Amino acid sequence: LGRINNDPLFGTTQADLFLQFKPPFYPYYYGNQGDTLVGIDSVVLALKYSGSWGDTTVAQQLEVSRIVDREFSDSSFKYHNINYSPMLGLPVSSIENIDIRTLGNKVYFAHGKDSSTNQIRIHLDPIYANEWYLYDSSQTGNYNAFRSDSLFRKLINGLAVKSVGSGNALMYLVLDDPGTRLEIHLRKRYNGRMDTSYVSLGIQTVTYSDLFQSAVANHVQRNRAGTPSVNPGPDELYLQTSPGSYVNLHFPALHPDSISNRVIN
């Protein structure tokens, strides 16, 4: 995830992330049975960070949008063009400036009750957060997303995290880590007592019963126009990705049958 705007050899790189967060069960409810939901304070998108490549002194600018593409779902039988990215709706966050150098610092949240490190945290719009107050598990209605997996995907089919504006590095994320989640911070009442807490929706990695695996996609677009890698000279080789990319070097004066294995500098 991220953007490289200034690579003199390989040009620009844009990496966007698309993912579905899902409840751990259906019908879903907030907190514990018997709790009465009073209100939603905020919704936070959290992404587990594991490293980066590039110039981390330039802040990354990230923006979150809704995924409104009904074709965005996990399937072993679905094939997409390499340029595919889901259709998006309106943004549900402001543009967040991420200083990669500070992601290792401890961050406290939930009124100081919890903390995290190596985590990108993006607060989503209050209007979007308020929608989560309306969702329920009723059999009918316009907001019964918590009733079943199919109804959930119909109303909430995922979020896109796009790099916009500045940036000169790529960030590596761990999607199946508990640190990657959608946090819903809420106020609830139990036995007449008010409390604040949060619940998390994660990336579902397996399919069982009535809960289906989450869909995830990573769209990486490179523009090498005008760079040396487009038209390399006869004495030049450019490899942008590793592992998986390699070249064979052939030296006419060095025959493989005439020498043993050697390291040549």
How does the language model describe each region?
Residues L1-N265:
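Secreted, disulfide-rich extracellular signaling modules
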